[in-house]
Amino acid sequence: MEIETWPIDKVIPYDTNPRVCPEKAVAKVAESLRTYGWRQPIVVDTEGVIIAGHTRRKAAELLGLKTVPVHVAHDMDPDDVRAYRIADNRVAEETRGDKDL
C-alpha cells in the first residue's frame, strides 16, 4: 500500500458521510495519534474525498496537524468506493469492546 503525505486541507470530508463523529470519539482518536502515531492512513478517492478516516481527519485537526498520511485508492471505481464506505461503517456498527481487556 502506497502512503503519501498530504496537506490536511486537501483531504475532503465526504459530504454525505453516514457516521457522526462525536467529540468524545475524536478526542480519543487524537490521544491515540499523540501516543502511538499514525498506524492507519486516511483512505481517499482520486479527488481527495475521504472514503475511510473521517474521525482520524477530525482528530488531526484537533491536534493542529498540517499534514496527514493518505492512501489514494486508485484501483477503486465509484461503485467500489460506495460499497467500501458502506462496509467500513457496518463493520464498526457490528463490533463491541471487550471490557476484560
Q: Can you say where each PLM-predicted feature lies in the sequence?
A:
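Short, charged/polar connector segments at secondary-structure boundaries
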Residues: 1-101
